[in-house]
């Protein structure tokens, strides 16, 4: 019997990994359709049902969804990683969106093609942006009993832990160095049996 859900993304962690973590946590069967990014990609891309030309995409019962955070929110509901009321979900969504804000700022530095411009971006990122976010995150985690929101494990925690390898790859350093709250979340998430089982079987990729 075919899996009820199909996730299509590149064969890396990045924006596909949060969905994989959340579905794995919920023991939700899904097809992990990994696309190799190589010289064949330009010919492969037109064959994929990409609503806006980007991945990941998520398929279910003949329907197709895009946008990684929207997919995460849907998957989190299925996996019961959401809050108990609308306000709690607002706090969880805000935490995940803020993590994504940081991801985009790191990406703007990492993917800069002009070496001189990239060097100009390095100082502000490492000396201002990262310390600002890490300090805020640490206070937030302390306030929420070791989690990002509502004092318990939610999809925001899985979102961070699943992105960490990719963030570290782009930075060339461990984002959790000197940040015990962030490190603790990563360790707790990776110790979850369902997540550990997924990590043990997933393909080895550069990031």
List each language-model region with its residue ranges.
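Hydrophobic alpha-helical bundle segments that form small-molecule/ligand-binding pockets
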Residues: 138-149
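GST-like domain detector, emphasizing the conserved glutathione-binding G-site
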Residues: 1-124, 128-132, 143, 152, ...
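Alpha-helical recognition domains of nuclear gene-regulatory proteins
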Residues: 22, 74, 136, 140, ...
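Short acidic/histidine-centered micro-motifs embedded in hydrophobic/aromatic stretches
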Residues: 95-98, 109, 161, 201-205
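C-terminal helix/juxtamembrane-tail motif
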Residues: 1-5, 183, 188-207
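GST superfamily/GST-like fold recognition
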Residues: 92, 148-173, 177, 181-185, ...
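Generic preference for well-ordered alpha-helical elements
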Residues: 16, 89, 134, 179-182, ...
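Short, solvent-exposed turn/loop segments enriched in Gly/Ser/Thr/Pro and often Arg
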Residues: 10, 155, 202
